[in-house]
């Protein structure tokens, strides 16, 4: 539980109060009353809280010492900039960002999100049974949120069960946009947790697009159906071997997208595999679910189904409401970030983002 404590240096900053949870100090705005810690990661700790002004339950994420690692600081800045613009019921809402006391020396960042009960990773690992309707509804919402992002010119690039938050009503929201990019931005840094990484990323292809997110969705959907990862590779080459074992060896024309000759030779050197039909891996799944999965987990990204077409697949019949799928453009220029920025400039840009959350006079 959250424990109210005195400020560490004995000096109480105006408008702030202090709590400890899981041996972590939270210096937060007085309108937020913490309840209990609900998650921990490399970034820090997340706690549930109540906004005493609105009575709304929220999640507060403390990112500790954010400038210790420049790449992590860039990820945080990217999430701040993106979530200020996106508005969709299947994308997590950033409700507030607490303004630090010291503009030029703050180290910790506190982000306030809408509160969700769990995430898809926890649900998959639980003993809770999942009906075909559950599977379909989770997939529908994921595709729906992704269609919105893609229509706004945004690739998520790190979709996995742990980044899909779920509440007791089975409502699903996509979160963690630290790796998201617009199409135009050249990308060299690490993308997508290995098990959910598309072949074109594993093969170091430079020219990739929305299909990388579709592959990740396919891996997630397979994991929902089978309650375990479909391609749990130990490293990149092993990951490719696991994929070929399932989808089968590829013809030359299916490898045209690989712009690296060495990578193409590696794929062609793998032992022949005729593949395994998904209906054999998931014998109890709805045949229409298997058909859609087959269209998402296609090795050649140019032949992979699009998000829009996946939403129109017969498996989704009865769920799609066209008027509920807005196509909105996020201002691309606002998401462009200089990857070579140093800490002081990142700190200043974060401060400017935080100012957008100050109450209007």
Curated annotation (Swiss-Prot):
Domain Protein kinase: start-end pairs: 32-316
Binding site for ATP: 38-46, 61
Keyword terms, alphabetized: ATP-binding, Kinase, Nucleotide-binding, Phosphoprotein, Serine/threonine-protein kinase, Transferase
Keyword Methyltransferase found: no
Pfam families for this protein: Pkinase
Residues recorded as bearing Phosphothreonine in the entry: 188, 193
Regulation of this protein's activity per its record: Activated by threonine and tyrosine phosphorylation.
Active site: 158 (proton acceptor)
Post-translational modification: Dually phosphorylated on Thr-188 and Tyr-190, which activates the enzyme.
Keyword ATP-binding: yes
Gene Ontology MF terms in the entry: ATP binding; MAP kinase activity; protein serine kinase activity
Motif TXY, residue numbers: 188-190
EC number, UniProt record: 2.7.11.24
Catalytic activity, as annotated: L-seryl-[protein] + ATP = O-phospho-L-seryl-[protein] + ADP + H(+); L-threonyl-[protein] + ATP = O-phospho-L-threonyl-[protein] + ADP + H(+)
Assembly mode: Interacts with MKK3.
Domain notes: The TXY motif contains the threonine and tyrosine residues whose phosphorylation activates the MAP kinases.
PANTHER family: MITOGEN-ACTIVATED PROTEIN KINASE
Family of this protein: Belongs to the protein kinase superfamily. CMGC Ser/Thr protein kinase family. MAP kinase subfamily.
Name of the featured protein: Mitogen-activated protein kinase 14
Organism field: Arabidopsis thaliana (Mouse-ear cress)
Gene name in the database record: MPK14
């Amino acid at each position: 539980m959250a424990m109210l404590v005195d400020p560490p240096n004995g000096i109480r900053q105006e408008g702030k109060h202090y709590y400890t949870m899981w041996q972590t100090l939270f210096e937060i705005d007085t309108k937020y009353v913490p309840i209990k810690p609900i998650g921990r990661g490399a970034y820090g700790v997340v706690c549930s809280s109540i906004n005493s002004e609105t009575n709304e339950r929220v999640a507060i994420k403390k990112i500790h010492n954010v400038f210790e690692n420049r790449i992590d600081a860039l990820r945080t800045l990217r999430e701040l900039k993106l979530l200020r613009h996106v508005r969709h019921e299947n994308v997590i809402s950033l409700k507030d960002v607490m303004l630090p006391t010291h503009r030029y020396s703050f180290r910790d960042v506190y982000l306030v999100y809408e509160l969700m009960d769990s995430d898809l990773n926890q649900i998959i690992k639980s003993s809770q049974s999942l009906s075909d309707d559950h599977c379909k509804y989770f997939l529908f919402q994921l595709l729906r949120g992704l269609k919105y992002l893609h229509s706004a010119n945004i690739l998520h690039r790190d979709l996995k069960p742990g980044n899909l938050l779920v509440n007791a009503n089975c409502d699903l929201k996509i979160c963690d946009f630290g790796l998201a990019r617009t199409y135009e931005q050249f990308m060299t840094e690490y993308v997508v947790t290995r098990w959910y990484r598309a072949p074109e990323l594993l093969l170091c292809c430079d020219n990739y697009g929305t299909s990388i997110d579709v592959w990740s969705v396919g891996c997630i959907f397979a994991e929902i159906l089978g309650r375990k990862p479909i391609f749990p590779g130990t490293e990149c080459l092993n990951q490719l071997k696991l994929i070929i074992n399932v989808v089968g060896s590829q013809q030359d024309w299916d490898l045209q997208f690989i712009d690296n000759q060495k990578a193409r030779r590696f794929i062609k050197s793998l032992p022949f595999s005729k593949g395994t039909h998904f209906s054999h891996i998931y014998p109890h799944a709805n045949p229409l679910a298997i058909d859609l999965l087959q269209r998402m987990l296609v090795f050649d990204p140019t032949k992979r189904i699009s998000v829009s077409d996946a939403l129109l697949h017969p498996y989704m019949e009865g769920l799609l409401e066209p008027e509920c799928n807005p196509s909105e453009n996020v201002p691309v220029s606002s998401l462009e970030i200089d990857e070579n920025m140093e800490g002081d400039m990142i700190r200043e840009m974060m401060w400017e983002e935080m100012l957008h959350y100050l109450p209007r006079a």
